[in-house]
Amino acid sequence: MSLKSKLSLSAVVGTALVLVPAMALAQDGAASNKYDANSWLAVAAGFAIGIAALGGTMGQGRAAAAALEGISRNPGAAARIQTPMILGLALIESLVLLSWVIAFFLQGKIAP
């Protein structure tokens, strides 16, 4: 596990450790507020887009780097490497777009 992934994981875990106790110790009266669920839906939609964009860009970057490394080692195989790389990039991008659609539907559940 690289240092960058360890730092990313510790940032996510640290954020969860800070936010979870505050939600667990919330008052009972605040749970009946109708705007509370709507605000968490908006936060969830924002996190969905952010995490999907982060994962998609990391996946696309690694796929492109591996394909370019393969082409640089064997330039004759460029045609055989390029087509699966483009297909893989399209599938990665479709997952990001799917998360965008889900976030859009979550925004539609928020009552004004």
From Swiss-Prot:
One of its GO terms (molecular function) is proton-transporting ATP synthase activity, rotational mechanism. The record marks 93 as: Reversibly protonated during proton transport. The chain crosses the membrane at residues 39-59, 86-106. It is found in: Cell inner membrane. InterPro entries: ATP_synth_F0_csu, ATP_synth_F0_csu_DDCD_BS, ATP_synth_F0_csu_sf, ATPase_proteolipid_c-like_dom, F/V-ATP_Csub_sf. GO terms for cellular component: plasma membrane; proton-transporting ATP synthase complex; proton-transporting two-sector ATPase complex, proton-transporting domain. It comes from the Bacteria. It is a multi-pass membrane protein. Keywords: ATP synthesis, Cell inner membrane, Cell membrane, CF(0), Hydrogen ion transport, Ion transport, Lipid-binding, Membrane, Transmembrane, Transmembrane helix, Transport. The keyword Phosphoprotein does not apply. F(1)F(0) ATP synthase produces ATP from ADP in the presence of a proton or sodium gradient. F-type ATPases consist of two structural domains, F(1) containing the extramembraneous catalytic core and F(0) containing the membrane proton channel, linked together by a central stalk and a peripheral stalk. During catalysis, ATP synthesis in the catalytic domain of F(1) is coupled via a rotary mechanism of the central stalk subunits to proton translocation. Belongs to the ATPase C chain family. This is ATP synthase subunit c. The lineage of its organism: Bacteria, Pseudomonadati, Myxococcota, Polyangia, Polyangiales. The gene is atpE.
